[in-house]
Design a protein with these regions (language model features):
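N-terminal pre-domain/capping segments
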Residues: 1-91, 126, 159, 183, ...
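Histidine-acidic metal/acid-base catalytic patches
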Residues: 1-28, 145-149, 153-158, 168-268
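Acidic-and-aromatic substrate-binding clefts and catalytic sites of carbohydrate-active enzymes
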Residues: 10-16, 34-46, 65-75, 101-105, ...
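Active-site acidic/histidine proton-transfer and metal-coordination neighborhood
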Residues: 18, 70-160, 254
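Conserved beta-strand positions in the central sheet of alpha/beta enzyme cores
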Residues: 33, 60, 94, 133, ...
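Catalytic-core regions built around general acid/base machinery
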Residues: 46-53, 117-125, 177, 222-225
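A short helix->loop->beta-strand "cap" motif at the edges of active sites that frequently abuts
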Residues: 56, 90-91, 130, 229-233
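Short, histidine-centered active-site or binding-site loop motifs used for metal coordination
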Residues: 62-65, 97-99, 205, 239-241
Length: 268
């Protein structure tokens, strides 16, 4: 079974998608994860045409901010992003947890409130048959293996995106995490780092690199686990540092071919 391989366009700001998406296709990717503002993307009809022309589907769309923020305007803006994601037919709508509380230690009630917000978003998305996917990430509210386990125990409709590098940073074996959270898993991120000199909550400092450049974890084992378990959802690779502000999206897409070649050498 061939895994579906996507590219995370997290560094794109004002890309010419009519040129950048064909470059991703040429680099060998099957789809792309989008994070751009709606006013840049334009109507779904327009974006669908651009994607179809490039044979490069939008596989995942992301939130702007986190669901624990209950401000009415913030929630409404993200509902519009969910509306858009549903009309585009994406596989899932990804979000992360928010920042840690200021001036005090985090408490269990903070995680409970965060999970409650995620479930409210998931309930809204469910009208479209759209799934939410919580992306684990260091230095945010949920910031340890224990926090992660607690948070997932509080979710029902909202599902999970495991970024295997962040699992590894929390000293949670990436392969084991896939197995342990399999029933909630609907998306996977691949990311690589060359070093991390501080491994304390809120202070992790990984030096991100393109997947395969440092091999901070056993990517072959991760991908084989997904293949052996017949994972049918998307697996998306993330670019590394330096941040690509100033580099046009086409150049970045062309350069991403090196990362795609690495994954092919692993058999994927």
């Amino acid at each position: 079974m061939a895994l579906k391989m996507g590219y995370a366009t997290l560094r794109w700001r004002q890309p010419d998608l009519s040129k950048a998406l064909p470059a991703l296709k040429k680099a060998g990717w099957d789809g792309w994860e989008g994070r751009l503002p709606l006013d840049w993307l334009g109507p779904p009809k327009r974006l669908k045409k651009v994607c179809e022309d490039a044979e490069m589907p939008l596989c995942v769309f992301t939130a702007s901010g986190s669901p624990e923020d209950r401000d009415w305007e913030h929630v409404e803006r993200n509902k519009r992003r969910m509306d858009y994601a549903a009309e585009m037919g994406v596989d899932c709508f990804m979000f992360m947890s928010g920042r840690k509380p200021e001036g005090r230690a985090m408490e269990r009630t903070d995680i409970e409130r965060a999970a409650e917000g995620a479930e409210q978003w998931a309930e809204y998305a469910a009208q479209y048959g759209l799934e939410l996917s919580y992306h684990i990430h260091t230095n945010l509210l949920v910031d340890s293996a224990a926090d992660w386990t607690l948070y997932m125990s509080l979710l029902d409709k909202a599902k999970l995106c495991i970024d295997v590098s962040h699992a590894e940073l929390w000293d949670y074996d990436p392969v084991q995490s896939l197995v342990d959270f399999w029933d909630q898993l609907n998306y996977v991120h691949l990311q690589d780092y060359a070093s991390c000199t501080v491994r304390d909550p809120g202070q992790y400092n990984p030096k991100w690199v393109s997947v395969g450049e440092a091999e901070c974890l056993d990517f072959t084992a991760v991908l084989k686990t997904l293949e052996d378990r017949n994972f049918t959802r998307w697996v998306t690779a993330c670019p590394g540092e330096p941040a690509y502000e100033g580099e046009d999206a086409v150049s970045e897409a062309e350069r991403s071919a090196g990362m795609r070649d690495y994954l092919r050498r692993l058999g994927y």
